[in-house]
Swiss-Prot record:
Residue ranges of the TM segments: 102-118
Keyword Flavoprotein: no
CC terms in the record's Gene Ontology section: plasma membrane
Membrane topology, Cytoplasmic segments: 1-101
Subunit structure: The complex is composed of 8 subunits; MtrA, MtrB, MtrC, MtrD, MtrE, MtrF, MtrG and MtrH.
Principal subcellular localization: membrane
Cofactor note: Binds 1 5-hydroxybenzimidazolylcobamide group.
Organism placement in taxonomy: Archaea, Methanobacteriati, Methanobacteriota, Methanomada group, Methanobacteria
Protein species of origin: Methanothermobacter thermautotrophicus (strain ATCC 29096 / DSM 1053 / JCM 10044 / NBRC 100330 / Delta H) (Methanobacterium thermoautotrophicum)
Protein name: Tetrahydromethanopterin S-methyltransferase subunit A 2
Cofactors required: 5-hydroxybenzimidazolylcob(I)amide
Gene: mtrA2
Function field: Part of a complex that catalyzes the formation of methyl-coenzyme M and tetrahydromethanopterin from coenzyme M and methyl-tetrahydromethanopterin. This is an energy-conserving, sodium-ion translocating step.
């Protein structure tokens, strides 16, 4: 017997920050970043709400954070796929989730990537992201079956939506340029 967990309505325009991603069931508790690997819609078919690559450790991470906090149903972030050389986006995402950001410099604490700075987001957004999702570390895992199994495991352990409402960032810099380099 499945217990129904509480879900919240997802904002109509979610995901509102432009990027290279595929959207699935918006009420799913799972978001997936595939780092340097392109897995098309495989994570979404496995049950993820949103999935896409993450090439940069600054604007790309800001886009992920902005779209995650805008959907309170998201409770897991699966970080999988090949690490991006130089940018090291997987390690940077893990550092952001574990350590946050130096408020004076904007540098992600403990990140080893080339330019790990969050410049377009308030502290409130970063802290909300860190509270909202559990990070599932699958860096360097590219096997679709392993990733699908972990997504399903997260779906089974869904604790329901955050009590807080969606946090929609009105940051004009995020999403500008629209280029692949900024995903």
């Amino acid at each position: 017997m499945f217990l129904m967990v509480e879900k919240k309505p997802v904002p109509e325009d979610w995901p509102h920050i432009v990027g290279d991603y595929v959207v699935g069931d918006e009420e799913s508790p799972v978001a997936v970043v595939t780092l340097g690997s392109h897995m098309e819609d495989e994570p979404v078919k496995a049950g993820a709400a949103i999935s896409g690559p993450l090439h940069t450790e600054n604007l790309g991470i800001e886009k992920v954070v902005g779209n995650v906090i805008a959907n309170p149903n998201l409770r897991f972030l699966v970080v999988c796929g090949a690490e991006v050389m130089g940018h090291i986006t997987g390690q940077t995402m893990k550092a952001l989730h574990s350590n946050g950001v130096d408020l004076e410099t904007g540098r992600i604490i403990g990140a080893t990537g080339a330019i790990p700075y969050i410049e377009n987001m308030p502290e409130e957004a970063i802290e909300r992201f860190r509270r909202q999702v559990e990070l599932v570390d699958m860096v360097d895992v590219e096997d679709p079956d392993s990733i699908a199994a972990r997504i399903q495991e997260c779906v089974v352990h869904d604790s329901g939506a955050m009590e807080e409402e969606p946090l929609i960032l009105k940051v004009p810099e995020i999403g500008k340029g629209d280029s692949e380099e900024n995903t």
